């Protein structure tokens, strides 16, 4: 089984470099991880979308960016069942290259649409807190709609070429899908991926850190000028939310992009084939860091829950209503059940009495 996966690059050098030697472990852990992501991500984001839609009359720029982020996460979860099956089968894609390409498209759309909308949210909050007078123009819903449309167009323009690129590859008796070794022969691959990391990670995280650092400075200045603000705990809650957003972003997106950047630099510094051990380590790191990055779609609803008072109140109200309906249904069904049992008992007694006569 270990020899089922050998890449052409390794074979040409006479080495049996199995980049999927970890498949026996991965076929258990990765489906489990993505099943949790699918359930939590789908339920959490659908709940967030329901709350946003119910409050559409009060929608503003922040809510609109959040809604687009939620839609991006829901779109991603729809592609997860096929990936779960792929990993459970030990990196074997059995439903054709066309669906593999569509899955890759959805994956990258979610990744970079999510990053872009998180960046939009940080800029939106920056103007709301640091430059409130300018924010009056930016918070206009028409302006925010234009920004959201631009983000989707940009992301689709960046990712649509994936539909024209073969994503699957025969490896022994299996077919891999959306794996890095499938693209190793692409011309100028290191430069392409380094450019993608620059635009899709380095630039957004720089903007996010700058915006939130300025917001923190403004909150500290406000607290010094007005002690009542500090006592109310509003600033502390805002700072905790900012820290949560930054920590989630760094934990989810940094490992993947750092792994890509360092490996591409190695390839540029050593144009020849890298050692099998280095390539296998990179392949394992990709699987681990991609799992971590995809977990971000589960974290977004929790950020809304703790950050947005209105969202938290709405969710709790919906849950209480659901529990209340369940309890009342159970209470109503209990007398009906007892009544039915009594009727059946009476009928049996009557039947026996009739037979006795």
Curated annotation (Swiss-Prot):
PROSITE patterns listed in its UniProt record: G_PROTEIN_RECEP_F1_1, G_PROTEIN_RECEP_F1_2
Region (Disordered): 336-357
InterPro entries: GP183-like, GPCR_Rhodpsn, GPCR_Rhodpsn_7TM
Membrane side Cytoplasmic: residue ranges: 54-73, 124-145, 212-237, 309-357
One GO BP: leukocyte chemotaxis
Disulfide bond sites: 100-177
Inducing factors: Up-regulated during B-cell maturation in the bone marrow, and is expressed in mature recirculating B-cells in bone marrow, spleen and lymph nodes. Up-regulated in B-cells after BCR and CD40 engagement. Down-regulated by lipopolysaccharide (LPS) in astrocytes. Expression is directly down-regulated by BCL6.
GO annotations of cellular component type: nucleoplasm; plasma membrane
Subcellular location: Cell membrane
Further remarks about this protein from its record: GSK682753A (8-[(2E)-3-(4-chlorophenyl)prop-2-enoyl]-3-[(3,4-dichlorophenyl)methyl]-1-oxa-3,8-diazaspiro[4.5]decan-2-one), an inverse agonist, selectively inhibits the constitutive activity of GPR183 with high potency and efficacy.
Annotated family: Belongs to the G-protein coupled receptor 1 family.
Protein name (record): G-protein coupled receptor 183
Lineage of source species: Eukaryota, Metazoa, Chordata, Craniata, Vertebrata
Gene field: Gpr183
């Amino acid at each position: 089984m270990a020899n089922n996966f050998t890449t052409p690059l390794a074979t040409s050098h006479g080495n049996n470099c199995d980049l999927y030697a970890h498949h026996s472990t991965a076929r258990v852990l990765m489906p489990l991880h993505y099943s949790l992501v699918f359930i939590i991500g789908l339920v959490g984001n659908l709940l967030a979308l329901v709350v946003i839609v119910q409050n559409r009359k009060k929608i503003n720029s922040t809510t609109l960016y959040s809604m687009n982020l939620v839609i991006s996460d829901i779109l991603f979860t729809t592609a997860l069942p096929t990936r779960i099956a792929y990993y459970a089968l030990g990196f074997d894609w059995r439903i054709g290259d066309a669906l593999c390409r569509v899955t890759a498209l959805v994956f990258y759309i979610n990744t970079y649409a999510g990053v872009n909308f998180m960046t939009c949210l940080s800029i939106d909050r920056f103007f709301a807190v640091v430059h409130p007078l300018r924010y009056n123009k930016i918070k206009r819903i028409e302006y925010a709609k234009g920004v959201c449309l631009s983000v989707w167009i940009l992301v689709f323009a960046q990712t649509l070429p994936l539909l024209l690129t073969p994503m699957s590859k025969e490896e022994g008796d299996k077919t891999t899908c959306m794996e890095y070794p499938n693209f190793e022969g692409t011309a100028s691959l290191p430069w392409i991926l380094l450019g993608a990391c620059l635009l899709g990670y380095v630039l957004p995280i720089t903007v996010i850190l700058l915006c939130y650092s300025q917001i923190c400075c403004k909150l500290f200045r406000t607290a010094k000028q007005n002690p009542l603000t500090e006592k109310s705990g509003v600033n502390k809650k805002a700072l905790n939310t900012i820290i949560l957003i930054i920590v989630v972003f760094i934990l989810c997106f940094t490992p993947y992009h750092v792994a890509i950047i360092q490996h591409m630099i190695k390839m540029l510094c050593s144009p020849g084939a890298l050692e099998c051990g280095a390539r296998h380590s990179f392949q394992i790191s990709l699987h681990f860091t991609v799992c971590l990055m995809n977990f971000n779609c589960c974290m977004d609803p929790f950020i809304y829950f703790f950050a947005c008072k209105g969202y938290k109140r709405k969710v709790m109200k919906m849950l209480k209503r659901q529990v209340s309906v369940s309890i009342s249904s159970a209470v109503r069904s209990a007398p009906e059940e007892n009544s039915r049992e009594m009727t059946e008992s009476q009928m049996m007694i009557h039947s026996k009495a009739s037979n006795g006569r």
